[in-house]
């Protein structure tokens, strides 16, 4: 026997009750996305590491500290996906979908990051992911935010979230701002946290995300990104806000909200909550017009977002209605074949049915009661001989000796 046989740290089993909640969340989100024209697709969990290196940059936190990567038996550098977007764009390029724009993709599944496990943050977790490729103009940003709002409403958590948004401006204005930010932060270099000092030359905009109290005091007086926007960028953000106002979407502009990856531009947004402590982000997204250029030399306007399923599940207690199975208990080996035939007929009628032929009848009945079932069908010698069934309603404790057609009537009431 292997001692202490447990899952890896930060990775959890999804038992049936958890899976029911996950499936409920996924199905709700998928249905809302379908109303917007999103079609489900899937990419491999494992990709060449260069897919993420190229998209996220080797100096990003994900690639430098959080990526699960290794060399396989064919000497290929591969990685477990830390997010969906890079794989979706890789798929878009490798499948030659450039001439089929616009495209709207929904994906879901596990992602992996080597992070410090805590409530709402695991090393393997699951996401809902939406990508809109060929999304031109602020109107598509507004529609994407509205989709996110509608998903949170369908999941009954929208009222417990706050929407924050910001504009990163165009690529040119971002470069100018980054230079100004570095100039400002260099004056406080010795006071910054160790992590922020490392980011200063590699990815300075990520410092704006720092949770360090020392960093926060310095950041509070840093240059504001919007002060370096071009007129075109200002017009774009104004137009987005106009559309959101028309749609009746409540939001606040957070000038410190950024993305540390170079391919982001213009709109970024987050839905946060106060119900989950430090892990406050429920859903986050933004526009990434530069990514397809970085990965494949294509210019594709795009916007998307992702939401953590585990965090959504922590937001409220979802009560999932579960179809109770009918248990069929044959009494004696001679009646097992007849019981199998009855179970098969029930399943053909889309009735969830379980046969339990082994063990003492008292123990089998107890197993049924433990499952909180509603009905039992007993099949003994007399029932088999008369082509009947003993049907017991566990709610009112009534028993009936009836034929199969009458059983169907009672089950379908």
Swiss-Prot record:
Any transmembrane segments, and where?
A: none
Q: List cellular component terms (GO).
A: cytoplasm
A Gene Ontology molecular function term for this protein is: ATP binding
Matching entries from InterPro entries are given as: aa-tRNA-synth_II (IPR006195), aa-tRNA-synth_II/BPL/LPL (IPR045864), Anticodon-bd (IPR004154), Anticodon-bd_dom_sf (IPR036621), His-tRNA-ligase (IPR015807), HisRS-like_core (IPR041715), HisRS/HisZ (IPR004516), HisRS_anticodon (IPR033656)
Q: Which reaction is the catalytic activity of this chain?
A: tRNA(His) + L-histidine + ATP = L-histidyl-tRNA(His) + AMP + diphosphate + H(+)
Q: What is its EC number?
A: 6.1.1.21
Which keywords appear in this protein's UniProt record, sorted alphabetically? Aminoacyl-tRNA synthetase, ATP-binding, Cytoplasm, Ligase, Nucleotide-binding, Protein biosynthesis
In which broad location class does this protein mainly occur, judging by the first location in its UniProt entry?
Answer: cytoplasm
* Organism domain of life: Bacteria
Q: Which HAMAP family match?
A: His_tRNA_synth (MF_00127)
UniProt lists the family membership as follows: Belongs to the class-II aminoacyl-tRNA synthetase family.
Recorded protein name is: Histidine--tRNA ligase
What is the source species? Rickettsia prowazekii (strain Madrid E)
Q: Which gene encodes it?
A: hisS
